[in-house]
């Protein structure tokens, strides 16, 4: 409690805004001014008059915040909080890939570095990936970096030829339908909601496939359902419980967070 009070005092003194991604641990989410997905948080911060942004997330998220708020100071509480998916592609590997497919348009998922985004034709989020790909004039698409998301998009937009970069989010890719099935045996009436970064077998088993922000809306479409199995980072369950306290949420996997209250305090 003393640490939380100190964080709040420093936030006020330094005119800071604290952002916490939906995947952060609940104590970090609870001290944040805004919680949400990476792009949504960066947009929220850009609309504030804060001088300092403390982004409780990973490196590419802080980069996005800086791009949208170039005149604000942006701090990442844990400098080692990286994203294996974003690290899986570099400008050099993107250029090599592009040379092999010169007639394709590069669509880059927001979970990537600023340098890679800058070399892409268009960027997308997991929430709008389908609509972005569908909107393109071309039928030939290079989708980077997440091949699981690319596969899901390709199913929704079969009229496009989508070539996927060979990278995954380890947190989502580790999930298997077998583990979802085991959880479902304990909760046979549960609604399964999966993130599109999950493997194909998990996505195919889900009732709903959507971004983290989309999950908050998806639960509302099942007013009679009591239990939901959530196939994404466990931190997302905290926001779901806050929005729907009368529902039960069961995680299909574990914890990958590195930001803690101490590191958030140190940033400020």
Where are these regions (language model features)?
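Single conserved hydrophobic/aromatic residue that forms the stacking wall/gate
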Residues: 261-268
